[in-house]
């Protein structure tokens, strides 16, 4: 079990053979900042979480390597540091398609009336999703790509991955 605080990651362990309320121990395994507004997601052997980076969002790929006793979080947005704005609210994971989607809120939208087919939607972050595609070959990541999908006259209010609505 991997747990997040604003500044660290912890793994649940036990001081005994089984985990009980008296034997449970939280071990700090890394000290990456974490944006508490965005829930981390698991994707296979990895966990993805976001960080605030100046006026943008960074995404980290957390992994644990039992062979080397390493716990690390690689910045998968290091090559696209200004791509994702700082108002991300959700990361969706799809292990079938080997992809993540980051959704951002529409802080500039002040419309309070329900949207209709005739309502003009301004070009804000709510009509955009940021997709991260990756490919592993025999346990080694061999290809990654970020893309930005802007959908005209649409306001993205959530997403569904593997029957889970966000």
Question: What do these predicted regions represent?
Answer:
Residues 1-166:
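Beta-sheet-dominated scaffold domains
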């Amino acid at each position: 079990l991997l747990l997040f605080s604003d500044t660290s990651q912890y793994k649940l362990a036990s001081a005994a053979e089984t985990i009980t309320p008296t034997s449970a121990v939280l071990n700090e395994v890394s000290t990456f900042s974490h944006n508490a507004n965005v829930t981390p997601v698991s994707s296979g052997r990895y966990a993805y979480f976001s960080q605030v980076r100046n006026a943008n969002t960074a995404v980290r790929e957390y992994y644990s390597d039992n062979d080397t006793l390493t716990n690390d979080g690689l910045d998968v947005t290091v090559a696209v540091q200004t791509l994702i704005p700082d108002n991300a609210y959700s990361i969706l994971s799809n292990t079938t398609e080997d992809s993540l989607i980051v959704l951002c809120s529409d802080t500039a939208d002040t419309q309070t009336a329900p949207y209709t087919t005739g309502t003009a939607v301004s070009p804000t972050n709510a009509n955009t999703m940021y997709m991260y595609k990756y490919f592993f070959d025999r346990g080694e990541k061999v290809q990654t790509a970020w893309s930005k999908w802007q959908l005209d006259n649409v306001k993205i209010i959530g997403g569904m991955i593997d029957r889970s609505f966000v």
